[in-house]
Amino acid sequence: MAMELTERERIIRTYRHQDVDRIPMLDSAWKGTKKRWVLEGMPKGVSWEDYFDFDHLIRVQPDNSPRYEARILEEKERYRIRTTKWGSTEKVFYELDSTPETLSFYYDTPEKWEEAKQRMLTDYEDRIPWDYLKENYPKWEAEGRFKQLTVWFGFDVAHSRLTGTENMLVALLDEPEWAMDIFDTYLKTSLALCQKILDAGYKFDGIFWYDDMGYKGTPFFSAQTYRELLQPFHKKAVDWAHERGMVAELHSCGFIEPLLPDIVETGVDMLNPLEVKAGMDPQKLKTLYGDKIGFHGGINAQLWDDIDKVKAEMERIIPIMKEGGGYIFASDHSIPNSVSLENMREIATLAHKLGKY
């Protein structure tokens, strides 16, 4: 395609499997990764997306939490222990790129859930980042950015933030009504806040939601459980977006291939991140479902610190994934701090070269 497109045009056309000038390049980098790149020569004050000529991730997320009191319980040399607005207690390490360790969950029973539910249904003006929108939206529009609303709902954010994994998995089998009420409340409150943003005159191109449904080699639950308990809410989110002229992207880490036929059936437009290290095979998915859904990611992040290996992987995967449209270049999760500035330069250059149509 001879014409150069804006980011917004390029990404929307990719979602719709239409001709583009090149594949979009949308990824996220760890804090430690960006710090390393600055130490190795990337100018301070320049975004890494601009430096490497990537497209930009613009996402706005309303707060549909129960507003549990967030406070610091303990301070240590290497970590602090705190409560979160979702009712969990976690140990947060000071090292860059560390993952908090969740110690306990307050809303871990159906009875306590009723308290959380009422708190989530309570409206507060500051659930929406109005000042952030007012300050940045004109710039996004002027620069032709693709903009997503982050919808906060599903299995992942419920088990990891609210109830605990074991409690949620048991609930899927023994107390499905409780699990579905959680999914429903999360979705209703999040979409209501998103609608307020649209009603205020802000225009968005798509929705995005996190719902990690797999780990290494297997999903957390069966396809039947997905169909009966979770898919109806995924479908509602997708329909909500499509009714408003927006596209829908699902981020689901882990091995979720057994769920793909049902995910495709919901009408999801784009799937991310195609986690190779968990067992996902991007080329297989492209062959089976590439005419029905787009793919975002799939370049094994464990290879990015070995430039020869990651280049070979890109040369193997990108030509197949971009065929017929519907592919966005990215790692299979995010860019780790093992990736040097020089490696990232070469990766970005090759992605641009292989991604041209």
What do the PLM-derived regions correspond to, one by one?
Residues 38-46, 93, 97-99, 343:
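Surface-exposed flexible segments
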Residues 1-35, 40, 81-83, 112-357:
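Active-site loop segments of alpha/beta catalytic cores
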Residues 36-71:
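Segments that shape or occlude catalytic/ligand-binding pockets
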Residues 22, 28, 51-56, 64, ...:
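Short linear motifs in intrinsically disordered/low-complexity regions
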Residues 69-122, 143-146:
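A contiguous, low-structure linker/loop signature
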